[in-house]
Swiss-Prot record:
One of its GO terms (molecular function) is argininosuccinate synthase activity. The keyword ATP-binding applies. This is Argininosuccinate synthase. The lineage of its organism: Bacteria, Bacillati, Cyanobacteriota, Cyanophyceae, Synechococcales. InterPro entries: Arginosuc_syn_C, Arginosuc_syn_N, Arginosuc_synth, Arginosuc_synth_CS, Arginosuc_synth_type_1_subfam, AS_cat/multimer_dom_body, Rossmann-like_a/b/a_fold. It comes from the Bacteria.
């Protein structure tokens, strides 16, 4: 008896998910494998991927356009939360996983499957993200994880696939593993596993090199309403179009490359190369506008909670009660985040050079100026400093005896 009768497999067209199709059928006795591939704005032509799944033995090969919910329900909350895992990585890949898992569960219900499956390996982050999301949404569904159990190396998996008629998509000339969606690209494996090897220019596709970037700087303006980016240079765009334009502008000037050592959920460190030009640009602009419009104590608390929000998403806990509670805090703060941020793009840099808010700015020029218009009561400072420093003076006096 097989491990399941009908399985819906999260499918990308890569080595592991392609090999999963015959493996589930031949090794685990699954009667029927249905694949689901998500269109997340990666720009690939998905029809060849759909046909590849059928050639590999899938009974049905489904493709779903998830671009709009990906941006509206996942990217925009991440921008509002200034989500940067370990202060650097803007979660471009991690944000996609709970959405794919959600749709995977929906497809399983629609076709009457008794299990879902994915092709994540045993030491990656995505296995955690998929398993936890599916458990939260459909605890009754079995989750099959052949790539976690088959103990094949990447080379052995490619060879297994070739025996089953699946062509290898990776050559020795291109040994990289690449994940791509509208928010960015992640590149790993091959020579990049040596943390001292510089990434070759060939691995980048969304960003110009510093040498190829324009020599002339470009100033752009990004408008936010309730924490969401809504316009660039005065042109209002829908959320998907705005992300695309931010990618184009930032990428043209070589901004958005990351080369980092990252702490994975499973406890190991990995070397990751990311291209996330638009998302990083929008987070930087959003942070700056918050500095102008949020009260100091709210801003300090939000910066602390942002780190926890990013960690929860990275660790696969999108559907957790704590993440839901943090969303409530983030959303409440964003009603004040309205205004404009001006950024100068030049040779890999994105420097904030201006910010304004007609309705919510807490920058009062008469209080901040050192000129003749100064309305700050300097005499009040003496009493404030006395009270503020009282605990220190009492502590010092007690030490002296």
């Amino acid at each position: 008896m097989g491990r399941a009768k009908k399985v819906v497999l999260a499918y990308s067209g890569g080595v592991d998910t392609s090999v999963c199709i015959p493996y589930l059928k031949h090794e685990w006795g699954v009667d029927e494998v249905i694949t689901f591939a998500a269109d997340l704005g990666q720009g690939d032509e998905l029809d060849p991927i759909r046909l590849k799944a059928l050639d590999a033995g899938a009974s049905q090969s489904l493709v779903g356009d998830l671009i709009e919910p990906f941006v509206e329900e996942f990217a925009l909350p991440a921008i509002r939360a200034n989500a940067l895992y370990e202060g650097r990585y803007p979660l471009s890949t991690a944000l996609a996983r709970p959405l794919i898992a959600r749709r995977l569960v929906e497809v399983a219900r629609e076709v009457g499957a008794d299990a879902v499956a994915h092709g994540c390996t045993g030491k990656g982050n995505d296995q955690v993200r998929f398993d936890l999301a599916i458990a939260a949404l459909a605890p009754d569904l079995k989750v099959l994880t052949p790539a976690r159990e088959w103990s094949m190396s990447r080379e052995e998996a490619i060879a297994y696939g070739e025996r089953c008629g699946i062509p290898a998509p990776v050559s020795k000339k291109s040994p990289y593993s690449i994940d791509l969606n509208l928010l960015g690209r992640s590149i790993e494996a091959g020579p990049l596993e040596d943390p001292m090897v510089a990434p070759p220019e060939e691995v980048f596709a969304m960003t110009s090199s510093i040498d190829a970037a324009p020599s002339q700087a470009q100033d752009i303006e990004i408008r936010f309403e309730a924490g969401n980016p809504v316009a660039i240079d005065g042109v209002r765009l829908d959320s998907v179009g705005l992300i695309k334009e931010a990618n184009r502008l930032a990428g043209r000037h070589g901004f958005g490359r990351l080369d980092i050592i990252e702490n994975r959920v499973v406890g190991i460190k990995s070397r990751e190369i990311y291209e996330t030009p638009g998302l990083l640009l929008l987070i930087r602009a959003h942070q700056e506008l918050e500095s102008l419009t949020l009260a100091a104590d709210v801003l300090r608390m939000k910066r602390q909670l942002e780190m926890q929000w990013a960690e929860l998403v990275y660790q696969g806990l999108w559907f957790s009660p704590l993440k839901d509670a943090l969303d409530g805090f983030m959303d409440r703060t964003q009603i004040y985040v309205n205004g404009l941020v001006r950024i100068r793009l030049h040779k890999g840099n994105a420097m904030v050079i201006g910010r304004s808010s007609d309705t919510n700015s807490l920058y009062i020029s008469e209080m901040a100026t050192y000129g003749s218009e100064d309305n700050f009561d300097h005499r009040a400072a003496e009493g404030f400093i006395y009270i503020w420093g009282l605990p220190s003076r009492l502590w010092a006096a007690a030490r002296r005896g």
